[in-house]
Amino acid sequence: CVRAVFPPPTHPTHARQTEESVSTKSTTATADYGAKDIQVLEGLDPVRKRPGMYIGSTGLAGLHHLIWEVVDRVVDEAMAGHCDRIGITLLADGSCRVDDNGRGIPVDPYPSGPHKGKSAAEVVLTVLHAGGKFGGEGYKVSGGLHGVGVSVVNALSQRVHLQIDRGGKRWEMEFTNGGKPVSKLAIVGDTPARGRKTGTTVTFLPDPTIFASEGTEFVARTVLERLQTMAFLNRGLEIAFADERPGREQQVTFQYKGGIVDFVKHLNQSKEALFSKVAHYEDEDEGQMLDIAIQWNTGYHEGIHG
Protein backbone atom coordinates (compact mmCIF):
# COMPACT_ATOMS: atom_id res chain seq x y z
CA CYS A 1 0.00 0.00 0.00
CA VAL A 2 1.35 3.37 -0.99
CA ARG A 3 -0.25 6.42 0.43
CA ALA A 4 0.46 10.01 -0.53
CA VAL A 5 -0.48 12.76 1.86
CA PHE A 6 -0.83 16.31 0.62
CA PRO A 7 -1.35 19.40 2.75
CA PRO A 8 -4.76 21.04 2.52
CA PRO A 9 -5.03 23.82 -0.06
CA THR A 10 -4.34 27.29 1.16
CA HIS A 11 -7.28 29.66 1.04
CA PRO A 12 -6.58 32.56 -1.37
CA THR A 13 -7.41 35.13 1.30
CA HIS A 14 -5.00 33.51 3.76
CA ALA A 15 -2.27 33.44 1.10
CA ARG A 16 -2.67 37.16 0.42
CA GLN A 17 -2.50 37.91 4.14
CA THR A 18 0.69 35.86 4.48
CA GLU A 19 2.34 37.61 1.52
CA GLU A 20 1.37 41.01 2.91
CA SER A 21 2.75 40.04 6.33
CA VAL A 22 6.10 38.94 4.87
CA SER A 23 6.28 42.04 2.70
CA THR A 24 5.59 44.29 5.71
CA LYS A 25 8.28 42.56 7.79
CA SER A 26 10.78 42.83 4.91
CA THR A 27 10.08 46.55 4.46
CA THR A 28 10.42 47.15 8.20
CA ALA A 29 13.70 45.22 8.36
CA THR A 30 15.09 47.19 5.41
CA ALA A 31 14.09 50.46 7.00
CA ASP A 32 15.75 49.48 10.29
CA TYR A 33 19.05 48.48 8.63
CA GLY A 34 21.17 51.52 7.88
CA ALA A 35 24.55 53.17 8.33
CA LYS A 36 24.16 53.09 12.10
CA ASP A 37 24.30 49.28 11.94
CA ILE A 38 27.73 49.22 10.29
CA GLN A 39 30.51 48.71 12.82
CA VAL A 40 34.09 49.86 12.33
CA LEU A 41 36.44 48.08 14.70
CA GLU A 42 39.78 49.77 15.26
CA GLY A 43 43.11 48.44 16.46
CA LEU A 44 42.96 44.94 17.92
CA ASP A 45 39.22 45.03 18.69
CA PRO A 46 38.31 42.81 15.69
CA VAL A 47 40.51 40.03 17.06
CA ARG A 48 38.87 40.09 20.46
CA LYS A 49 35.39 40.26 18.93
CA ARG A 50 35.95 37.34 16.54
CA PRO A 51 39.08 35.45 17.67
CA GLY A 52 38.13 32.35 15.68
CA MET A 53 38.71 34.26 12.44
CA TYR A 54 42.37 34.66 13.40
CA ILE A 55 43.35 31.54 15.36
CA GLY A 56 40.68 29.05 14.28
CA SER A 57 39.00 28.50 17.65
CA THR A 58 39.01 29.51 21.30
CA GLY A 59 39.62 25.94 22.43
CA LEU A 60 42.95 24.19 22.97
CA ALA A 61 43.83 24.33 19.26
CA GLY A 62 43.45 28.11 19.26
CA LEU A 63 45.32 28.42 22.55
CA HIS A 64 48.35 26.60 21.16
CA HIS A 65 48.09 28.60 17.94
CA LEU A 66 49.30 31.59 19.98
CA ILE A 67 52.60 29.78 20.52
CA TRP A 68 52.84 28.82 16.84
CA GLU A 69 52.45 32.43 15.74
CA VAL A 70 55.24 33.70 17.99
CA VAL A 71 57.52 30.79 17.08
CA ASP A 72 56.78 31.07 13.34
CA ARG A 73 57.90 34.69 13.41
CA VAL A 74 61.28 33.51 14.66
CA VAL A 75 61.45 30.65 12.15
CA ASP A 76 61.14 33.24 9.39
CA GLU A 77 64.06 35.07 10.97
CA ALA A 78 66.04 31.82 10.93
CA MET A 79 65.12 31.08 7.30
CA ALA A 80 66.44 34.52 6.40
CA GLY A 81 69.77 33.56 7.98
CA HIS A 82 69.58 35.81 11.05
CA CYS A 83 68.79 33.33 13.84
CA ASP A 84 69.97 29.84 14.81
CA ARG A 85 68.29 29.29 18.17
CA ILE A 86 64.75 29.50 19.55
CA GLY A 87 63.75 28.93 23.16
CA ILE A 88 60.20 28.09 24.25
CA THR A 89 59.43 27.96 27.96
CA LEU A 90 56.14 27.17 29.70
CA LEU A 91 56.34 29.20 32.91
CA ALA A 92 54.93 28.37 36.33
CA ASP A 93 52.35 31.18 36.20
CA GLY A 94 50.75 29.76 33.03
CA SER A 95 52.47 32.11 30.61
CA CYS A 96 54.73 31.18 27.69
CA ARG A 97 58.08 32.73 26.85
CA VAL A 98 59.60 32.60 23.36
CA ASP A 99 63.14 33.95 22.94
CA ASP A 100 65.52 34.03 19.99
CA ASN A 101 68.92 35.32 18.93
CA GLY A 102 67.71 37.03 15.77
CA ARG A 103 68.14 40.67 14.83
CA GLY A 104 65.56 41.93 17.30
CA ILE A 105 62.34 43.67 16.28
CA PRO A 106 63.22 47.22 15.12
CA VAL A 107 62.95 49.86 17.85
CA ASP A 108 63.29 53.08 15.85
CA PRO A 109 60.27 55.39 15.34
CA TYR A 110 57.83 54.51 12.59
CA PRO A 111 58.44 57.01 9.77
CA SER A 112 55.00 57.88 8.39
CA GLY A 113 51.23 57.51 8.45
CA PRO A 114 48.88 57.39 11.44
CA HIS A 115 51.49 55.53 13.52
CA LYS A 116 54.28 58.01 12.85
CA GLY A 117 56.48 58.50 15.90
CA LYS A 118 55.57 55.23 17.62
CA SER A 119 58.33 52.67 17.94
CA ALA A 120 58.29 50.05 15.19
CA ALA A 121 58.09 47.39 17.91
CA GLU A 122 54.88 48.88 19.30
CA VAL A 123 53.38 49.06 15.80
CA VAL A 124 54.21 45.39 15.14
CA LEU A 125 52.53 44.31 18.37
CA THR A 126 49.45 46.54 18.23
CA VAL A 127 48.54 46.96 14.55
CA LEU A 128 47.10 44.21 12.38
CA HIS A 129 48.94 43.56 9.10
CA ALA A 130 52.12 45.25 10.36
CA GLY A 131 55.42 43.42 9.89
CA GLY A 132 58.50 42.92 7.78
CA LYS A 133 57.15 40.15 5.54
CA PHE A 134 54.80 42.11 3.30
CA GLY A 135 57.42 43.75 1.11
CA GLY A 136 60.94 45.10 0.93
CA GLU A 137 64.14 43.14 1.45
CA GLY A 138 63.70 42.09 5.09
CA TYR A 139 62.67 38.52 4.29
CA LYS A 140 62.92 36.34 1.19
CA VAL A 141 60.50 33.76 2.58
CA SER A 142 57.75 33.75 5.18
CA GLY A 143 54.75 31.75 6.26
CA GLY A 144 51.85 31.88 8.71
CA LEU A 145 50.18 35.12 9.65
CA HIS A 146 53.37 36.92 10.69
CA GLY A 147 53.22 40.55 11.63
CA VAL A 148 49.52 39.91 11.94
CA GLY A 149 50.34 36.96 14.17
CA VAL A 150 52.26 38.68 16.96
CA SER A 151 49.64 41.40 17.23
CA VAL A 152 46.92 38.74 17.38
CA VAL A 153 48.74 37.05 20.26
CA ASN A 154 48.88 40.42 22.01
CA ALA A 155 45.17 40.98 21.43
CA LEU A 156 44.23 37.63 22.98
CA SER A 157 46.53 37.87 25.99
CA GLN A 158 45.97 39.15 29.48
CA ARG A 159 49.56 40.29 29.65
CA VAL A 160 52.49 40.56 27.22
CA HIS A 161 56.08 41.48 28.02
CA LEU A 162 58.39 42.40 25.15
CA GLN A 163 62.18 42.44 25.49
CA ILE A 164 64.52 43.37 22.65
CA ASP A 165 68.31 43.32 22.48
CA ARG A 166 69.51 45.52 19.66
CA GLY A 167 72.34 47.98 19.12
CA GLY A 168 73.99 47.07 22.43
CA LYS A 169 70.92 48.11 24.42
CA ARG A 170 68.08 46.20 26.03
CA TRP A 171 64.59 47.56 25.42
CA GLU A 172 61.37 46.56 27.17
CA MET A 173 57.65 47.23 26.86
CA GLU A 174 54.54 45.78 28.47
CA PHE A 175 50.96 45.36 27.33
CA THR A 176 47.86 44.34 29.24
CA ASN A 177 44.19 43.44 28.72
CA GLY A 178 44.25 42.72 25.01
CA GLY A 179 47.22 44.73 23.80
CA LYS A 180 46.93 48.03 25.68
CA PRO A 181 50.41 49.52 26.21
CA VAL A 182 51.32 49.98 29.87
CA SER A 183 54.27 52.19 28.94
CA LYS A 184 56.31 53.17 25.91
CA LEU A 185 59.23 51.10 24.65
CA ALA A 186 62.23 52.14 26.73
CA ILE A 187 65.87 51.25 27.31
CA VAL A 188 66.34 49.39 30.60
CA GLY A 189 70.09 48.87 30.32
CA ASP A 190 72.85 47.47 28.17
CA THR A 191 72.66 44.10 26.49
CA PRO A 192 74.26 41.63 28.95
CA ALA A 193 77.88 40.77 28.21
CA ARG A 194 77.04 37.06 28.29
CA GLY A 195 74.38 35.45 26.18
CA ARG A 196 72.81 36.75 23.00
CA LYS A 197 73.91 40.04 21.49
CA THR A 198 70.68 40.64 19.61
CA GLY A 199 67.23 39.07 19.70
CA THR A 200 63.64 39.25 20.89
CA THR A 201 61.80 37.73 23.83
CA VAL A 202 57.99 37.65 23.92
CA THR A 203 56.28 36.46 27.10
CA PHE A 204 52.50 36.20 27.01
CA LEU A 205 49.74 35.07 29.35
CA PRO A 206 46.58 34.01 27.45
CA ASP A 207 43.37 35.81 28.40
CA PRO A 208 41.09 33.37 30.31
CA THR A 209 37.99 35.30 29.23
CA ILE A 210 38.82 34.48 25.59
CA PHE A 211 39.75 30.83 26.18
CA ALA A 212 36.98 30.10 28.65
CA SER A 213 35.72 26.87 27.05
CA GLU A 214 38.80 24.68 27.58
CA GLY A 215 41.05 26.84 29.73
CA THR A 216 44.52 28.30 29.24
CA GLU A 217 46.73 25.37 30.25
CA PHE A 218 49.25 24.47 27.57
CA VAL A 219 49.82 20.78 26.78
CA ALA A 220 53.55 20.00 26.67
CA ARG A 221 53.16 17.03 24.33
CA THR A 222 51.29 19.15 21.77
CA VAL A 223 54.02 21.78 21.88
CA LEU A 224 56.84 19.22 21.65
CA GLU A 225 55.38 17.47 18.61
CA ARG A 226 55.08 20.75 16.74
CA LEU A 227 58.56 21.94 17.72
CA GLN A 228 60.19 18.69 16.64
CA THR A 229 58.57 18.95 13.21
CA MET A 230 59.78 22.56 12.91
CA ALA A 231 63.31 21.47 13.77
CA PHE A 232 63.23 18.77 11.08
CA LEU A 233 62.01 21.26 8.48
CA ASN A 234 64.62 23.89 9.38
CA ARG A 235 67.98 22.18 9.09
CA GLY A 236 70.44 23.07 11.84
CA LEU A 237 68.03 25.30 13.77
CA GLU A 238 68.21 24.65 17.52
CA ILE A 239 64.83 24.64 19.24
CA ALA A 240 65.01 24.35 23.02
CA PHE A 241 61.87 23.57 25.04
CA ALA A 242 61.51 23.85 28.81
CA ASP A 243 58.53 23.25 31.09
CA GLU A 244 58.90 25.01 34.44
CA ARG A 245 55.44 24.20 35.78
CA PRO A 246 55.57 22.42 39.16
CA GLY A 247 55.50 18.64 38.84
CA ARG A 248 56.00 18.73 35.07
CA GLU A 249 59.53 20.06 34.77
CA GLN A 250 61.42 18.93 31.70
CA GLN A 251 63.88 20.17 29.10
CA VAL A 252 64.14 18.96 25.51
CA THR A 253 66.28 20.30 22.66
CA PHE A 254 65.72 19.54 18.98
CA GLN A 255 68.35 20.10 16.31
CA TYR A 256 68.76 18.13 13.10
CA LYS A 257 71.79 18.69 10.89
CA GLY A 258 70.25 16.51 8.21
CA GLY A 259 66.94 18.39 8.04
CA ILE A 260 64.24 16.46 6.21
CA VAL A 261 66.62 13.53 5.65
CA ASP A 262 66.55 13.05 9.42
CA PHE A 263 62.77 13.56 9.29
CA VAL A 264 62.33 10.66 6.86
CA LYS A 265 64.59 8.46 8.99
CA HIS A 266 62.46 9.36 12.00
CA LEU A 267 59.24 8.48 10.16
CA ASN A 268 60.70 5.16 9.03
CA GLN A 269 62.33 4.15 12.30
CA SER A 270 59.55 1.70 13.18
CA LYS A 271 59.46 0.27 9.65
CA GLU A 272 61.80 -1.91 7.61
CA ALA A 273 63.61 0.25 5.07
CA LEU A 274 64.44 -1.25 1.67
CA PHE A 275 67.56 0.90 1.34
CA SER A 276 69.71 2.23 4.17
CA LYS A 277 70.38 5.57 2.47
CA VAL A 278 67.71 8.25 2.17
CA ALA A 279 67.45 9.69 -1.35
CA HIS A 280 67.77 13.47 -1.16
CA TYR A 281 67.55 16.29 -3.68
CA GLU A 282 67.52 20.05 -3.23
CA ASP A 283 67.73 22.97 -5.63
CA GLU A 284 66.90 26.65 -5.92
CA ASP A 285 65.83 28.59 -8.99
CA GLU A 286 64.55 32.15 -9.27
CA GLY A 287 63.93 32.37 -5.54
CA GLN A 288 62.01 29.09 -5.36
CA MET A 289 63.49 26.35 -3.18
CA LEU A 290 62.93 22.60 -3.46
CA ASP A 291 63.97 20.05 -0.83
CA ILE A 292 62.95 16.38 -1.20
CA ALA A 293 63.86 13.27 0.80
CA ILE A 294 62.60 9.74 0.02
CA GLN A 295 63.13 6.31 1.55
CA TRP A 296 61.20 3.19 0.56
CA ASN A 297 60.05 0.64 3.11
CA THR A 298 58.30 -2.75 3.05
CA GLY A 299 54.93 -1.27 4.02
CA TYR A 300 51.91 -0.92 1.75
CA HIS A 301 50.99 2.67 2.64
CA GLU A 302 52.61 5.81 1.28
CA GLY A 303 53.46 8.70 3.53
CA ILE A 304 53.82 12.14 1.99
CA HIS A 305 54.67 14.99 4.35
CA GLY A 306 55.21 18.61 3.42
Task: Report the location of each language-model feature.
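Conserved ATP-binding N-box helix of the HATPase_c
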Residues: A61-C83, G149-N154
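Flexible hinge/switch segments at interdomain interfaces of large molecular machines
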Residues: V40-R48, L91-A92, D99, P192-T203, ...
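GHKL/Bergerat-fold ATPase module in large chromosome/replication-associated machines
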Residues: F241-G306
